[in-house]
Every structure is written in structure tokens, then in C-alpha cells.
Amino acid sequence: DGRGWPAQVAARAHARSATAEMHSGFGALRTQLPMNMRRTPDAYRWDASADRDIARIQEIWRELRAQHGAGGPFLCGAFSIVDAMFAPVVSRFLSYGVAMDANAQAFAEAIQSLPAWREWCAAGAAELEYLEGTERFRA
């Protein structure tokens, strides 16, 4: 029935495409900047392949916001599935101190303003389990 996606056809198609790219791509980002909401930025530095993923993600965010984001602070204006798909990337960018352009920073702030985000962060902070050998970058 389309709920969760932008109502406008072009915005919905663009959001679905970005969601598919997020789902299937960005392997270097996923490998080198694993999600850990307890982590705080430090001197760790990733390689050029992760930099390319970071640049592509910020490009996607710029395109979506420029073409479809006039109706609100999220990628296609109002919060939608595409925003939820990129929320873990916001977490990674914050946890690793990734430099964000003004557009990416605005999107990250919009995500951080969500009650669900704050709840997610609190749950992550309360997590005590540490899996030796799988959690390469301990908080």
C-alpha cells in the first residue's frame, strides 16, 4: 500500500533505489567501521575504499535532499523507510568521527532528534556484552 515510502512517485522511486544500494552495498564501510553505538571517536583511520563508500553515501543524501527533501528534515522530506535504512550509517559516522558535509550533518541531526534514535542509543549504551574476536573496535 506504499506506507513508509514517499507519496510522490519520483521520490518513492529514488528512495527505493537508495534503499537497495544501502542494502547491498558499502562493504568497506560495514567491514572497517562496524556498528558499535558505545564507541567514541578516536585516532582509528579507515582506508580509501571506506572513504569512497562515505563519499557515495553523502552524495546519495545530497541528491535525495536536494530533489525531494523540501518537505522536512529527512532525505525525502518526511521520515520514511530510506531514513531508517541509513540510520545505522549515521551511527557509524558519529562513532568513528567521520567528517560530514553540512547536508549530511543536517540529516544526522534530524535522525538524532527522533525518540526512537534516543531509545536505540540508550539500549546500545546499556549493552554489556563484548564478543572477543568479533567486536574489533571496543568502546
Where are the predicted features?
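Acidic/histidine-enriched, glycine/proline-rich intrinsically disordered or flexible terminal extensions
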Residues: 124-139
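GST superfamily/GST-like fold recognition
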Residues: 73-99, 103-105, 110-113, 118-121
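Amphipathic alpha-helical packing segments from all-alpha helical-bundle domains
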Residues: 47-65
